[in-house]
Amino acid sequence: MEWPACGMMAVSAMSLNRRNFIVGGLAVPALARKERAAPRPNLVLIVADGLGSWMLGCGGNREIRTPNIDQLAQSGARFENQFACTPASSPSLATLYTGRVPRQHGIQDFLTGEPIENPPQGQAAAPPSFRNEVLLSDILSANGYECGFVGNWSLGDDSTPQHGYHFWSACDGSLAYQNPRISSNGKAATESGYLTELLTAKAGAFLDQQTAAKPFFLTVSYPNPHPPYGGHPARYYEMYAKASFETTGWERAAANALRDKEYLADTVGNNRKAAAAVTALDDQIPLLLAKLQQRGLRENTVIVVTSDNGYLLGRHGLWSAGLASNPINMYDEVVGTPMIWHWLGHVPPQSVRPEVVSTYDFVPTVCELLDLPVPAGGNLCGRSYLPLLMGKPLPKKSPWRHTVFGQYRNTEMARDTRFKLVLRNAGAGPNELFDLGVDPREKINQYDNPKYLNDRDQMARAIEGWRRTTAG
């Protein structure tokens, strides 16, 4: 058992925040542009909201239709053991974009104007220090990328462009799927139509402005399949009108269900609606690919599909994500997220990677792919998995780690390919240990089983070490 060393790829030991990262729009010397013979590839990051890897056809789901995402995975690489650090939208996205974990970037829960005190749910605002965090968009913008953001920001002020983005179209937090209010480069207006399709059109407008002369980074953060489940086009509901969802393993509402009891009252009916939202998202993929092809940008564009967290949709008798239960849960359905990479002629097709990777590995991987330094002083605990992505062996002296970690409020997790340990309240409990080799659905808590004490204690020490290395 081991935990990752933080800052392993930093270019210096200097403290780095957004203020000393960018001065007058120019990168400071620590992250100055590097000369490069070949043009850097473009990057399109497609982020779903509440899409677990188990909800995709390529992830084994036999009832929800995702042919386009499945095809991207088939023609590229899919990490089947990718886990979000936090099963909640705002902290997970902050980790995805910064490579830092909640105790570092300060967003501990989903951001809402109405947090609940008991049990704690939601966070009123990002801490003031978050504006000084260095996001991937800051790095790429400072290194010559044209950066565009479209969709659900979830990290605070979404009215004006943030963190190095030049093009900005953000939907508000209400997630109204029909006739939504969208802020485009500082001007908010209600727009007619279906939100998901409107966001794809906004992404297309950004791509229409791009040429091969300058690389670009586009984030398309879709609200699908997050509730509310109304407002999607009728054709998607019709697809699932008779679906039984017998294979999804849903259960009646659990005694510790905290939220979403209205969805659990009609689990099959609401699974039909959730599936409709997933397929509506899936149908946006070919539209984005067609626009890239039309602009002559497809071959030099890396496409990544991921999500902030998953949803249970009735598994374990719960509906949403980490806060679906009291205490917070870290089930694979909510921490297991897609991580699909597609780059024609570069990423080997039909690649299914078994290594355990995390959301906090994304920024280091992109930086290595684009030949850019990882921010110095950021205390990043992630590691680039670019060699794995490209089907190349790692150095024998530097094998891939076996364990990833998670944190959500008072709950911490360590997971490898065999075990998952969940510690709450700094180990005071209630705690859980699952032997995933014989219990993949996480039904049998082995925490107090004498047979597993060595494994449990080894993972607990790993969490303690990770906690120390990610402090501050």
Which stretches of residues belong to each language-model region?
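Alpha-helical elements of Rossmann-like donor-binding domains used by nucleotide-donor carbohydrate transfer enzymes
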Residues: 20, 24, 68, 91, ...
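Polar, surface-exposed loop/tail segments
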Residues: 66, 96, 152, 161, ...
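Active-site beta-strand termini and strand-to-loop segments that position acidic
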Residues: 414-417, 424
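C-terminal segment of N-terminal export signals and the immediately downstream linker at the start
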Residues: 7, 11, 32-45
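N-terminal secretory signal peptides and thylakoid transit peptides that target proteins
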Residues: 12-26
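N-terminal secretory signal peptides
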Residues: 1-16
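Active-site segment of extracytoplasmic enzymes that catalyze sulfate/phosphate-ester chemistry
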Residues: 46, 52-148, 167-174
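Active-site-proximal cap/lid insertion segments
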Residues: 37-41, 48-63, 170-357, 369-379, ...
